[in-house]
Amino acid sequence: MTSRFRLPAGRTYNVRASELARDRQHTEVVCNILLLDNTVQAFKVNKHDQGQVLLDVVFKHLDLTEQDYFGLQLADDSTDNPRWLDPNKPIRKQLKRGSPYSLNFRVKFFVSDPNKLQEEYTRYQYFLQIKQDILTGRLPCPSNTAALLASFAVQSELGDYDQSENLSGYLSDYSFIPNQPQDFEKEIAKLHQQHIGLSPAEAEFNYLNTARTLELYGVEFHYARDQSNNEIMIGVMSGGILIYKNRVRMNTFPWLKIVKISFKCKQFFIQLRKELHESRETLLGFNMVNYRACKNLWKACVEHHTFFRLDRPLPPQKNFFAHYFTLGSKFRYCGRTEVQSVQYGKEKANKDRVFARSPSKPLARKLMDWEVVSRNSISDDRLETQSLPSRSPPGTPNHRNSTFTQEGTRLRPSSVGHLVDHMVHTSPSEVFVNQRSPSSTQANSIVLESSPSQETPGDGKPPALPPKQSKKNSWNQIHYSHSQQDLESHINETFDIPSSPEKPTPNGGIPHDNLVLIRMKPDENGRFGFNVKGGYDQKMPVIVSRVAPGTPADLCVPRLNEGDQVVLINGRDIAEHTHDQVVLFIKASCERHSGELMLLVRPNAVYDVVEEKLENEPDFQYIPEKAPLDSVHQDDHSLRESMIQLAEGLITGTVLTQFDQLYRKKPGMTMSCAKLPQNISKNRYRDISPYDATRVILKGNEDYINANYINMEIPSSSIINQYIACQGPLPHTCTDFWQMTWEQGSSMVVMLTTQVERGRVKCHQYWPEPTGSSSYGCYQVTCHSEEGNTAYIFRKMTLFNQEKNESRPLTQIQYIAWPDHGVPDDSSDFLDFVCHVRNKRAGKEEPVVVHCSAGIGRTGVLITMETAMCLIECNQPVYPLDIVRTMRDQRAMMIQTPSQYRFVCEAILKVYEEGFVKPLTTSTNK
């Protein structure tokens, strides 16, 4: 049937045109918004309105104060090419298909620190977002961290663990990760029991504090292909632009390095600053799948740079001719920046707001397989970190970090004289204190173990909302290609990266008058339970570097937090005092009449320091070759670039900043066995214990020894260097040491300490004198010879098992040139020592036993150094921070101090530059 028909008078009537005219008069459209609690809410708006109108009605519905962190993502776009609703563009021009339209309410900008979010309700929205991203596979997460995050989520939703109510299988109706295995629930339940006393708000804060350490936290990915037609991913984040290829981060371009980002048609360009040795600036080009994908990536870069790096958005450019014609995109980010958002939240946030949390219905959501979606672009277990500075927080996320709920006394400088009027009391708690080295410069010994404080949970849980319907977005694979043409003259969409104006504080920084008074009394051993670093002599502010759980510093209200800057100690200004003087001031508090320590701190000032150092962060280059290179040349290029990055990082100091931010203990790893009553005496230091998952287990009834397996895999080779990192034997653990050596088949022991340093016993002599023999249980050790020089000693021994009547030759290599305090001034002797170790263990597959006193500091330095040498030989890039992270995933606190880390970084650079170890054409074993 046609739309035209002839009337008797010979006239026509166009039915379709009439219907279109009718539709044009109906301007109201329906937008279905999928919220973060998996509910769908319909909103009616005028299709001619700007996108901001729809955003405003959604924010009003949610009663959301801190709005600038969130946005609406178009649901018809795939997640690998995200497109956000533009607040300054008419809705009808963005939503092309017929009403109703579907959009997803999501977090758009992920803050680096949850303390920047002022309202508990805002943090709850973040919590829902990240929980959803992990469940759907959008945010890959290692299993141990996933279990810890899930336990915080359970604590938030179910409250305290109750053995009578939380029976076996009480988590069977919940899903937290894709393809969740059955034993995963048991691990969650075990961790859930450790969170007794945490309120929902505290559990969610700890959830966010842990989630921000994930590799892909806050990264928005867009897919592309390189010159070999291999898939790469271009990620946009707060710090700059990332390039991933074959699961490996190939490079990072910080905003400081980028001059301009631009696009034309489907070609996206990054223009980099000119290096000193370069004659002109570098222009990188990438071919996207189409114009829309290219512009989406460009807009994401503009928004992230403006939000995180500028104090305020750039004003629109005024041009007389702009009314008549335009060239390029008129898009500019016009919302609040992070600086403005934090300040706005402080002024407008309702911190006493009460709201109802939605119960999880995770099984209603159809899970997505990340591996299938990304076509092996990323793996949650095998993602390799190469060039991006770590975003991990200082230390392990603390289970009782509640600065967001306990508002401290806010003081201005004019009120400092009245500090004595503000009294805060702490609750007593039983604590255990670690041993402290006389060479330590810490204010107090680290206190790690304590009996849990008994806190009364909240009076009641907020009412639960009805079960929600869930929804899943489709993920479509998009293909891109890579271009390196220099098309400077053909670009029609540009965004110049402005130089940051002088500003009093970096983005999100805390104003100088935002001070908090903290009071605490020492425990029965005279310890406060926190460490500080910095001082006038170190040209750094005094920063709290660690707060141990269950200690006075942890239990006081307001709580002392890692990253707080100490301004006054007992009313004394410490701005011009050295580190040692600051330590003495803190110790002297125990001798005061009141015995009380009074600190005036600037909360979380460490983030000011970190962001200020971003101005001097190392530059990274990613310069595609004109023709595909063979793998050997590619590896050599990556190795050279990693050494350039390391050298610049040592000059600017960013390597130490990144090291300070790395977790000391891997989140989720337990050390329960070391704390059993029968094993406590076997630990040389109370705060240095082996992980349960990687500890060496002895045969027999008493199976404990303070030792961990550490395996270091060398990529692109068959090499896996196996170590056993352990503490120096005590008089009553020598038998355990030799039993471990025998059972593990080890034929080499590397010792990195002398027996006594500065009057303190660091290691008991667990071997006999030359030509002598000693028995240790059923093991007899004979020392045949001892020779060496001023730096190291070689001992040839025989280990004899009297029960089995079997013997084994054994070599002990002891390094004796490490100074009593600090690190060696020159690494030459140490590098010679490492080379001897490598030569002695060549061809051996059994683990090498390595120990110093605690088994973490110098032991970590040696393992890092040998691993770096192997990587150089195999033409692989060397990233020391990744090596330390890998070690700490297997034994806590490996490489103990920043000075040790700097020493090994300088030694690695020396090995490369002076040719101690040279790349081989083929990967061979040592």
From Swiss-Prot:
<dbReference type="InterPro" id="IPR035963">
    <property type="entry name" value="FERM_2"/>
</dbReference>
<dbReference type="InterPro" id="IPR018979">
    <property type="entry name" value="FERM_N"/>
</dbReference>
<feature type="active site" description="Phosphocysteine intermediate">
    <location>
        <position position="852"/>
    </location>
</feature>
<keyword id="KW-0472">Membrane</keyword>
<dbReference type="Pfam" id="PF00102">
    <property type="entry name" value="Y_phosphatase"/>
</dbReference>
<feature type="binding site">
    <location>
        <position position="896"/>
    </location>
    <ligand>
        <name>substrate</name>
    </ligand>
</feature>
<dbReference type="InterPro" id="IPR000387">
    <property type="entry name" value="Tyr_Pase_dom"/>
</dbReference>
<feature type="compositionally biased region" description="Polar residues">
    <location>
        <begin position="398"/>
        <end position="408"/>
    </location>
</feature>
<comment type="subunit">
    <text>Interacts with MAPK12 (via C-terminus); this interaction abolishes PTPN4 catalytic autoinhibition and thus activates the phosphatase activity.</text>
</comment>
<dbReference type="InterPro" id="IPR016130">
    <property type="entry name" value="Tyr_Pase_AS"/>
</dbReference>
<dbReference type="GO" id="GO:0005737">
    <property type="term" value="C:cytoplasm"/>
</dbReference>
<dbReference type="InterPro" id="IPR014847">
    <property type="entry name" value="FA"/>
</dbReference>
<dbReference type="GO" id="GO:0005856">
    <property type="term" value="C:cytoskeleton"/>
</dbReference>
<dbReference type="InterPro" id="IPR001478">
    <property type="entry name" value="PDZ"/>
</dbReference>
<dbReference type="InterPro" id="IPR000242">
    <property type="entry name" value="PTP_cat"/>
</dbReference>
<dbReference type="Pfam" id="PF00373">
    <property type="entry name" value="FERM_M"/>
</dbReference>
<dbReference type="InterPro" id="IPR019747">
    <property type="entry name" value="FERM_CS"/>
</dbReference>
<feature type="domain" description="PDZ">
    <location>
        <begin position="517"/>
        <end position="589"/>
    </location>
</feature>
<feature type="compositionally biased region" description="Polar residues">
    <location>
        <begin position="430"/>
        <end position="456"/>
    </location>
</feature>
<dbReference type="GO" id="GO:0005829">
    <property type="term" value="C:cytosol"/>
</dbReference>
<dbReference type="InterPro" id="IPR029071">
    <property type="entry name" value="Ubiquitin-like_domsf"/>
</dbReference>
<protein>
    <recommendedName>
        <fullName>Tyrosine-protein phosphatase non-receptor type 4</fullName>
        <ecNumber>3.1.3.48</ecNumber>
    </recommendedName>
</protein>
<feature type="region of interest" description="Disordered">
    <location>
        <begin position="430"/>
        <end position="475"/>
    </location>
</feature>
<dbReference type="InterPro" id="IPR011993">
    <property type="entry name" value="PH-like_dom_sf"/>
</dbReference>
<dbReference type="GO" id="GO:0005654">
    <property type="term" value="C:nucleoplasm"/>
</dbReference>
<dbReference type="InterPro" id="IPR029021">
    <property type="entry name" value="Prot-tyrosine_phosphatase-like"/>
</dbReference>
<dbReference type="GO" id="GO:0009898">
    <property type="term" value="C:cytoplasmic side of plasma membrane"/>
</dbReference>
<keyword id="KW-0378">Hydrolase</keyword>
<dbReference type="Pfam" id="PF00595">
    <property type="entry name" value="PDZ"/>
</dbReference>
<dbReference type="GO" id="GO:0004725">
    <property type="term" value="F:protein tyrosine phosphatase activity"/>
</dbReference>
<dbReference type="GO" id="GO:0006470">
    <property type="term" value="P:protein dephosphorylation"/>
</dbReference>
<dbReference type="InterPro" id="IPR018980">
    <property type="entry name" value="FERM_PH-like_C"/>
</dbReference>
<keyword id="KW-0963">Cytoplasm</keyword>
<keyword id="KW-0904">Protein phosphatase</keyword>
<comment type="subunit">
    <text>(Microbial infection) Interacts with attenuated rabies virus protein G; this interaction is required for virally-induced apoptosis.</text>
</comment>
<comment type="function">
    <text>Phosphatase that plays a role in immunity, learning, synaptic plasticity or cell homeostasis. Regulates neuronal cell homeostasis by protecting neurons against apoptosis. Negatively regulates TLR4-induced interferon beta production by dephosphorylating adapter TICAM2 and inhibiting subsequent TRAM-TRIF interaction. Also dephosphorylates the immunoreceptor tyrosine-based activation motifs/ITAMs of the TCR zeta subunit and thereby negatively regulates TCR-mediated signaling pathway. May act at junctions between the membrane and the cytoskeleton.</text>
</comment>
<keyword id="KW-0206">Cytoskeleton</keyword>
<dbReference type="Pfam" id="PF09379">
    <property type="entry name" value="FERM_N"/>
</dbReference>
<dbReference type="GO" id="GO:0008092">
    <property type="term" value="F:cytoskeletal protein binding"/>
</dbReference>
<feature type="binding site">
    <location>
        <position position="820"/>
    </location>
    <ligand>
        <name>substrate</name>
    </ligand>
</feature>
<dbReference type="Pfam" id="PF08736">
    <property type="entry name" value="FA"/>
</dbReference>
<feature type="domain" description="FERM">
    <location>
        <begin position="29"/>
        <end position="312"/>
    </location>
</feature>
